[in-house]
Amino acid sequence: MNVLTAPIKNDTWTEATWEEFIQATENPDYQRGKFYYYQNQLRIELSPISSDHAHDHSTILGGIHLYLATHDLNVAIKDNCSYRKADKQEAQPDISCYVGNNADVIPSGTGIVNLNDYPPPDLVIEIANISLADDQGKNGYFMKS
């Protein structure tokens, strides 16, 4: 296994093997980060959550809950859940939802959702502030693969 010796640049796509990515996710220096892996590149977002992002996040979640309170839908909402396809990809969208028959597909007690075992969410929401280009680019393509 390769050993990452240099610090990983924040909010930048960096060439890395899957093993280096896993090593970074286990590094205590990055424990507060959001991790992404796509096409042999990793990205760690260590940015603090801004007031605007927190407001938008809670507003969107509130809207989802309000909609669900007035409609008969079976939905499981995941807040900042990690989705992993081993040796290929990982992402942590701000909000994700499993709808209908998929609502109960992820059992309680599941940590990182293994996309080799479970389907991807039916709805993924990434709240963009300064990261809009990434959210529409590599981050956005993750769930489509």
Where are these regions (language model features)?
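Gly/Pro/Ser/Thr-rich low-complexity, intrinsically disordered segments predominantly at protein N-termini
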Residues: 1-144
